Amino acid sequence: MSTTNAFPKTIYAIQHLAFEDLGSLEDVFYQLGFRVRYFEAGVDDLTPAFSHDGLTIILGGPIGVYETEDYPFLKDEIALLKQRLAADKPTLGICLGAQLIAHALGAKVYAGHQKEIGWGPLSLSLRANQVLSPLLNNVHVLHWHGDTFDLPENAVLLASSEIYTNQAFEVGNNILALQFHIETTEENFEKWLIGHTCELRNANISIPKLREQNLQYAQALEHAAFEVIQKFLKRIGYSG
């Protein structure tokens, strides 16, 4: 996949929650001439999303990768993901998607010592400069998770936060896992606050403060996310 014409021009996105979509990344893909096809985990057959040769993006959601008894579809999703990763096909995981990648690669995924919800900066490794360098200069990303993961074997750590060390990793050039969110938009954020109201209340997290942070940091993150996804596309073989 070394030329623009050879790289598949459909992005396959797997959702686990309706309002957690590709967000600002979807606009980037459309600007670059890609099509986007969504699949709903637990509803749709995910086989096409995992078997194709282009980029698959696994999005976030409130369930844990270990909750397979309550959500049996996770077993099939993980099995398909293992096959995809073994074939080294381009894959990006965000939040739950990153946890699924870690689990599929044999790492432990488990409930963390505290929830990390809100906007904050990252500490990036030197290796992160290849793809995540747009997140330097105090760009704040959106953290929204309670689970965490150990670093998979042969994975390279790319980013950490004050609360959790393992915030992003890569395996080779084609597999990228982000525990944090880069896709959220200023306009869509209210849906997150409504959809996650029980979680926010139970964690005693200030919704007005989250709104304030969104207004302060979201636009800069959108610009950085545009550059991050372009760098990742270039690395996995898209040269447009």
Regions found by a protein language model. Name each.
Residues 3-9, 16-21, 47-55:
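Accessory recognition modules or surfaces
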Residues 11-29, 42:
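N-terminal beta1-alpha1 ligand-phosphate binding loop
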Residues 4-13, 110, 125-240:
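Amide-donor transfer/coupling interface in amidating biosynthetic enzymes
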Residues 84-108:
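Catalytic nucleophile loop
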Residues 114-118:
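Short Pro/Gly-enriched coil loops immediately N-terminal to beta-strands
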Residues 22-24, 67-69, 102-104, 153, ...:
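Short glycine-/acidic-enriched loop or helix-start segments at secondary-structure transitions
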Residues 27-92:
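Flexible gly/pro-rich beta->alpha loop and the following alpha-helix that scaffold active-site loops
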